[in-house]
Amino acid sequence: MSTEEQAEWFEFNQETVEALIEDGSDSTKPHTIEYHFAGDDFDVLEKAAVDAFKAGFEVGDAEELMLDDGGTIFCFDAVVERLLDVDLINADTVKLLAIAQKQNVQFDGWGTYFIES
């Protein structure tokens, strides 16, 4: 993982957390954070899922998706409950980027759901 890539994800994390809070999502309540992984080799992606599980994340079943060009890709989510705390999300990002690099799969960011105050 390059320092530049990590910095870009940290910026994404900051902007996303700020936008959620500005929109009124309750920052005092835990949010379900879904970190996304993708790859074209199911067996390799499965190894990344095992690593994410060992790192403390709940791992969903891998799904096969059809791409617009007719190709296929596999993906899964590594899920954790977190407050909207950039430091915690950045720490998760460091762990998960390392897993993605080790297993040669794509880390594809994260998402969550709005929680009303």
Swiss-Prot record:
Location in the cell: Cytoplasm
- Pfam families linked to this entry: RraB (PF06877)
Entry keywords, A to Z = Cytoplasm
Q: Which InterPro entries match?
A: RraB (IPR016716), RraB-like_sf (IPR036701), RraB_dom (IPR009671)
SUPFAM superfamilies given in the database record: Hypothetical protein VC0424
Does the record carry GTP-binding as a key word? no
Major localization class? cytoplasm
Question: According to the lineage, what is the superkingdom?
Answer: Bacteria
Task: One GO cellular component term, please give it.
Answer: cytoplasm
Gene Ontology molecular function terms on file = endoribonuclease inhibitor activity; enzyme binding
Q: How does it assemble?
A: Interacts with the C-terminal region of Rne.
In which family does this protein belong, per the annotation?
Belongs to the RraB family.
Q: What does this protein do?
A: Globally modulates RNA abundance by binding to RNase E (Rne) and regulating its endonucleolytic activity. Can modulate Rne action in a substrate-dependent manner by altering the composition of the degradosome.
HAMAP family registered for this protein in UniProt: RraB
> What name is this protein filed under?
Regulator of ribonuclease activity B
Whichever gene encodes this chain, its name is rraB
